[in-house]
Curated annotation (Swiss-Prot):
Keywords linked to the UniProt accession: Plastid, Ribonucleoprotein, Ribosomal protein
NCBIfam families, per the entry: rpmJ_bact (TIGR01022)
Subcellular location: Plastid
Membrane-spanning intervals of the chain: none
Organism (species): Cuscuta gronovii (Common dodder)
Sequence similarity: Belongs to the bacterial ribosomal protein bL36 family.
Full protein name: Large ribosomal subunit protein bL36c
Pfam families: Ribosomal_L36 (PF00444)
PROSITE patterns reported for this sequence: RIBOSOMAL_L36
GO biological process: translation
Any GO CC annotation of this UniProt entry: plastid
Molecular function GO terms recorded: structural constituent of ribosome
Keyword Plastid on entry: yes
Chief location: plastid
Length: 37
């Protein structure tokens, strides 16, 4: 999980979701997991 100031989709399978006020990117590729903060 990478923590970034700006999260964005890297590939077509990346999904932006909001969980508990935080923005996360979940993907089938574990390298694409990102969290904001």
């Amino acid at each position: 999980m990478k923590k970034r100031a700006s999260v964005r989709k890297i590939c077509d399978k990346c999904r932006l979701i909001r969980r508990g006020g935080r923005i996360l990117v979940i993907c089938s590729n574990p390298r694409h997991k990102q969290g904001q903060g």
